[in-house]
Each structure stands twice: as structure tokens, then as C-alpha cells.
Amino acid sequence: MERPNNRKLMKLKSILFFLAALAVTSCGTARYYGGASAGSIGTMAAFRPCSYISYIDRSGKQQYDDSLSAVSAQLVAMASEDAALPVSEWLPLDEAGQQEVVSFMDALAGASPKLVGVMPVPSVLDSLLEEAGYRYGLILFADGMVRDTRNLVREAVKEAAIGVALAVLTGAVVVSVPDRCVSALRAVILDAEQNRIVYDHAVVREDEDPLDLQDTRRLVRKVMKDFVGRGLP
């Protein structure tokens, strides 16, 4: 699949799109259900997965990584095929299409279910579905972070020192362990005919690796199970 244009993606906020949106939930999950299910919509296309993975280097600097994002997107595609999702065709995305998906995910981050229900389908994606002869289209968008091991050790030592200092002052031992990685996945189903979102399920998991196939499989099953209505492989 084509890889996103690094320069254009770097113009967007270098953040995890879903973390802010899901921080207020206890389970790291956000859902919107507009009546769509595998049994009710019949034929559905899916866009080739997109991914936005950032890397925290040894010094603690975090930035978007094009190569890691490409690997993550490929893993989502593999996990989706393993799960036997009810998809008739996978539609490729050119640079404009990938940019549209990233911008759309940015707009969805933090949106309430009420707002998701009235948000229009992006014009580029709507046109791609209509040209391919499909009313419904699935977006799978991965988001996440991986941390350099040396930075992880340094941050862990720093947090431990802070914990010891607080224990001396308060008598309570509290040590915060930095995340080695964070993985998130969002599944959005578009209705090109009615120009609206009919399904949206996003999940964030700390210490699950966006570059690990087994972790990615778990996320795919999680975000799609309400739509499919059955256990996925």
C-alpha cells in the first residue's frame, strides 16, 4: 500500500488522537452505534488501513515515524484478514485519501456520540465509495506510540526517585511507571448514500504494541465485535 506523505502528516498535531478522547472513560473505549450491523448492511468495502505512530527517542523527543506507521498499517491489514471481516473489497487510498482519513480522525477525536451521529462523510472518501459502487465503507485507523528502551529506563529511574522522595515526605509509596508503548484503533463505517457515520468504535490500550501482530489482532476483534455480532477468529 502507499505510504502517507511524512511532511504533510507532520503538519498535524503530533499527538495520540484517541488518548484525549478516551481519557475520561474507565475502559479506554468510545462507541457510537447508528444501527449498522453486518446483517443489516450487506455488502461493504473497506479502505486500506492507515496508521499514525509516533516514536519517543532516547532524549524524550516524540515525533511521527513514517516507517513505523507503514508497519502498523500493514499489521492492521493482516489482522483484519485473519479476522475474516465481512468486507467485499479493499479500496486503495492515494495521498489525498490518506490525508483525508487522518484529518477525519483528528476531527473525531473527543467528539461526543451526538456529534459523531451528525458528522458528514469526507468528500474524498464519499466519492471513492460511490465510484467503486458501494454504499458502505469501513475505515480502520491505528494510532500509537513506542518508546526507546533507553528512554524508558531513564524515565523509570526518574519516577522511582520521585516516588522515594514523596514517600519520605508523606509516608505513602507511589511510583508511576512510564508506558513502554500505547496502541489505539478506531473503526468507522460510513454511509455514502445518507452521508453519515453509522458505526464508530475506538479503543486505547496501554502497554500494547502497535507493532505487534497479536496485540493488533486483539484490537481489531475489540473494535469490530459489536458490528459483526459474533466471535471473531
Regions inferred by a protein language model and the residue ranges of each:
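Context-gated lysine
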Residues: 8-13, 61, 114, 158, ...
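Flexible, glycine- and charge-enriched loops at secondary-structure boundaries
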Residues: 17, 65-69, 209, 213
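Sec-dependent bacterial lipoprotein signal peptides
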Residues: 1-25
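Prokaryotic Sec-type signal peptides and long signal-anchor helices
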Residues: 21-22, 108, 231
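C-terminal/domain-edge helix-coil "capping" segments
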Residues: 27-56, 127, 131-133, 144-233
